[in-house]
Design a protein with these regions (language model features):
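Bimodal "functional hotspot" detector
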Residues: 3-8, 14, 19-162
Length: 162
């Protein structure tokens, strides 16, 4: 009797854990910037924050996903790093390299902000596709990022006294 009760309990726990795992995987993280009012330097969270978005039947539609990304976040405290009305002009994906051309509205961004915006977009694209690197072109600017080039933790550096 104890064995039967133990097996039933174990089966119920396994079924519950399986359900939790599926729900967690349903959303794709879209990466945006924290508003400056919500960002504290030298904390565990960086300036970039993920927001889970449900793509439902559009999971494999990169054009749709990027349009949804550029529309901006839904979570309070996050903001889109790109100017409003930024659009995707072209998308090319070949040999794990994604090449995106954006409208030239990002020309209004200073270089550090453009790099931050491209980092957010690269991280989002790497969640959507198996990319080794992402190249983003906007007007006369171009940047290529891969997972190894992303430093995402803002931490104080200790000086060596030797």
């Amino acid at each position: 009797m104890k064995r039967l009760l133990s097996l039933c309990t174990l089966a119920c726990l396994l079924l519950c854990l399986t359900g939790c795992h599926t729900a967690e995987q349903s959303g794709i993280p879209f990466y945006y910037c924290r508003d400056s009012a919500h960002y504290q330097y030298f904390q565990q969270d960086g300036v970039i924050c993920g927001e889970k978005r449900d793509l439902a039947s559009h999971r494999n539609d990169l054009d749709y996903a990027l349009g949804l990304y550029l529309a901006g976040p839904m979570t309070e405290g996050l903001s889109s790093p790109f100017p409003k009305n930024t659009q995707v002009i072209s998308i090319r994906y070949h040999d794990e390299t994604l090449h995106l051309e954006l409208s030239d509205l990002s020309r209004s961004l200073p270089d550090p902000e453009f790099t931050l915006a491209c980092t957010c977009l690269t991280m989002t694209c790497m969640e959507l596709l198996p990319c080794a690197q992402v190249t983003i072109v906007s007007a006369d600017r171009s940047i290529t990022l891969n997972a190894d080039s992303l430093l995402l933790f803002d931490a104080p550096q200790e000086e060596s006294t030797q």
